[in-house]
């Protein structure tokens, strides 16, 4: 019954308003800007190839930063072990991201990508099956925090926004690293992408908010970036979608990745 209702909603002509939750982070002197090489030969790559990973659903929460970072960590671990990928609890990541950004989890208002990367560097990540957190207001137990400390990233870098397309291709193709990205959402365009699986400009609609996603590949055949979303498997191509160069360059807020020796 719920599935049928959702399918009917996605067939409506009026654009849907989506749950988002990413704030634009202003570049400052705290940042380590990723250095990139020019002239990367574009070729298709899919960091989720052979990995049994399903898109998640953030429901009506603003926890997209936690979901996107969880996907990034799964991809990193899959580089070490594709046959048995780990799923990471997004509520744990979202908890620490908000604590670092706002000092509280009283409000489910989203977070910043900087604090999301910082959260996993400082407090690690929890394997889903070992975690009791099941809502955006849950607090981790001391034993869970101790367990998460074993899975920390060593460093992270901001991608240069002024040459974001080249930076994304370099990071994905040359370094084979996933990217945590935030984009402005234009409801009509993202509603169309939910049906076609491709995000591209289709007008001058105002931006309605920011949304965090994970970039995991590049398709040379149509010059698009592959991305995971957190709006469930009924959206896009079973929860995944492609981003056109025009949309990425126009609506990118900020983007980050881990250092090459990430664990």
Predicted feature residues:
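Short alpha-helical basic/polar micro-motif
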Residues: 62
């Amino acid at each position: 019954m719920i599935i049928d209702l959702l399918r009917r909603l996605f067939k409506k002509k009026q654009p849907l308003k989506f749950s988002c939750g990413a704030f634009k982070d202003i570049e400052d002197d705290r940042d380590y800007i990723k250095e990139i090489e020019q002239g990367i030969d574009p070729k298709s790559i899919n960091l989720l190839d052979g990995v049994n990973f399903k898109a998640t659903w953030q429901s009506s929460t603003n926890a997209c930063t936690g979901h996107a970072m969880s996907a990034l960590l799964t991809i990193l671990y899959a580089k070490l072990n594709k046959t048995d990928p780990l799923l990471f609890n997004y509520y744990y990541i979202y908890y620490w991201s908000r604590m670092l950004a706002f000092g509280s989890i009283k409000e489910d208002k989203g977070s910043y990508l900087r604090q999301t990367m910082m959260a996993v560097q400082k407090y690690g990540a929890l394997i889903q099956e070992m975690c009791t957190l099941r809502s955006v207001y849950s607090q981790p137990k001391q034993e869970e925090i101790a367990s998460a400390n074993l899975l920390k990233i060593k460093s992270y870098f901001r991608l240069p926004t002024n040459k974001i397309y080249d930076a994304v291709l370099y990071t994905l193709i040359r370094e084979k690293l996933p990217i945590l990205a935030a984009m402005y959402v234009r409801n009509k365009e993202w509603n169309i992408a939910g049906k076609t699986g491709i995000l591209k400009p289709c007008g001058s609609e105002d931006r309605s908010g920011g949304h965090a996603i994970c970039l995991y590949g590049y398709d040379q055949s149509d010059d698009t970036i592959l991305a995971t979303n957190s709006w469930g498997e009924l959206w896009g191509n079973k929860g995944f979608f492609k981003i056109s160069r025009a949309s990425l360059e126009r609506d990118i807020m900020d983007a980050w990745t881990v250092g090459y020796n990430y664990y």
